[in-house]
Regions:
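Juxta-kinase regulatory segment immediately upstream of eukaryotic protein kinase catalytic domains
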Residues: 1-19
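ATP-binding glycine-rich loop module of kinase domains
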Residues: 20-23, 28-62
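Protein kinase-like catalytic core scaffold
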Residues: 42, 77, 91, 147-150
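The N-lobe alphaC helix and its flanking beta3-alphaC-beta4 segment of protein kinase-like domains
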Residues: 56-74
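Conserved structural core of kinase catalytic domains
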Residues: 57, 78-114
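Conserved alphaE helix
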Residues: 113-121
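C-lobe/activation-segment region of protein kinase-like
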Residues: 126-131, 142-173
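Hydrophobic residue at the +6 position relative to the catalytic HRD Asp in the kinase catalytic loop
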Residues: 134-139
């Protein structure tokens, strides 16, 4: 895992440099950084090829791009995909500031409306034969609106849907 001392100072997307502000997180498929270009902030995701014992990947970057298109077609609220740098395996996304659901759960600040909003996403996803990664770090609330900030989606399987898997992580301890 990267630390503040090992963070790159600058990352480029299609030859355009972005100043790295901080590491936002590491997922199954990549590292996500908060980056800046002038006064505008973005998320830059760098695909990694570290092994994941519980998940099999093909081409991670192409999967992200395909999944983004599928979710966008269903109007799932998520950050806009701004650019893809295929040779460097990087994606530039809109940055959506706000608290993640895991932070809200830990603070005891979950609102019933957030569950209604994720259920509305499920109502779009399931008929299309899809699930998303319902883990609470993948959701940000901005001004009361819930956004899915990952692009991952998979073929629907009941054991991985929100009611059977995701909800357990959205509950107050």
């Amino acid at each position: 895992m990267e630390t503040e001392n090992t963070l790159p100072k600058v990352l480029t997307v299609n030859e355009h440099p972005y100043t790295v502000l901080r590491l936002l997180g590491k997922g199954k498929g990549g590292y996500s950084y908060l980056v800046r270009d002038g006064d505008k902030e973005y998320v830059l995701k760098q695909i990694h090829h570290e092994p994941c014992s519980y998940y099999q990947f093909g081409d991670k970057l192409r999967s992200e791009l395909r999944d983004y298109a599928r979710l966008k077609a269903l109007d799932i609220p998520m950050p806009a995909l701004l650019e893809a740098d295929i040779p460097r395996e990087r994606i530039l996304k809109e940055y959506i500031p706000g608290d993640t659901i895991d932070v809200l759960v830990s603070r005891g600040a979950m609102e019933p409306d957030y569950l209604r909003q994720v259920q509305a996403m499920c109502d779009c996803l399931y008929p299309a034969g899809l699930n998303i990664d319902y883990y609470p770090t993948n959701f940000v609330v901005r001004e009361g609106r819930l956004f899915y900030i990952d692009y991952e989606c998979n073929t629907y399987m009941e054991q991985w849907d929100f009611a059977h898997w995701g909800i357990q992580y959205w509950k107050q301890p």
